[in-house]
């Protein structure tokens, strides 16, 4: 896969230019138990993402088991890792949720709500950590301002689309015209579906905001803990290699990296994430350990997504074929 090759190539280049005799001694004395802890933090990230999806579904009146939520999460992690800006994960989650009996419009709301929760956390946490640490202040604040501006514009567009029934009809008509340009038969077939699912999306939004205000707080806290687990991984790796954790600096850098990685250039942000990490961490981590740190971090946070995600995808395919065979 292109993403894996780019990730390995860029990591190898970083390792080559930062390697020294000390690098190899660092690798030899690495605490493998702590590296396992770093991997378990990644596992907890998956589990918390699945928990958040289950809670969102429950708040909207759907009962999806935690196992199914985890299955959906891992399958989407796989597709996100092989598509630019991780964009492939969202359609997979919508499809798999709808396969579990959730309407398409409601499934789309659940997936979009996940991303809005993430964005809310990033946009509130990054300025706070930049002020507290004073790390990469100029660059970090530019990233924060751009990200918050885009988030507000996106939320305003959503409000304009879903504020009332007539605006939904207008947007549905625009979708119909756009699809008709590429495939007239499909546009005619799904013309009524556009409006129906957009209305369900609006209903899910209203239900969530009116019926579950405390649920939104719970979801935000789950989001905070989920990303904190992921952002703690580099600090644990550093301790495993015999260095200080630099937790606050590392957390701030991770917030910047996750936002920069949203730029849709390469599958799974391969190359972008590695270079961003090397650049930011070079401000407080010794140069000779950068290559090892970047390599282990991407192995734990990216390559495991592909490996375990692929297992989940294959499991889902085998299970669906088995069910079909049982029915026929």
Curated annotation (Swiss-Prot):
Which ranges of the sequence are coiled-coil? none
Which Pfam families would you find in this protein's record?
Answer: LPG_synthase_TM
The protein's UniProt keywords, in alphabetical order, are: Cell membrane, Membrane, Transmembrane, Transmembrane helix
GO cellular component annotations of the record: plasma membrane
Q: Where are its TM segments located?
A: 31-51, 116-136, 139-159, 221-241, 245-265, 277-297
* Cellular compartments annotated: Cell membrane
Look up and give the membrane topology term: Multi-pass membrane protein
InterPro entries on file: L-PG_synthase/AglD
Name the major location: membrane
What family is this? Answer: Belongs to the UPF0104 family.
Recorded hits in NCBIfam families, A to Z, give: flippase-like domain
The protein in question is named UPF0104 membrane protein AF_2231
- Tell me what organism the protein belongs to: Archaeoglobus fulgidus (strain ATCC 49558 / DSM 4304 / JCM 9628 / NBRC 100126 / VC-16)
Lineage summary: Archaea, Methanobacteriati, Methanobacteriota, Archaeoglobi, Archaeoglobales
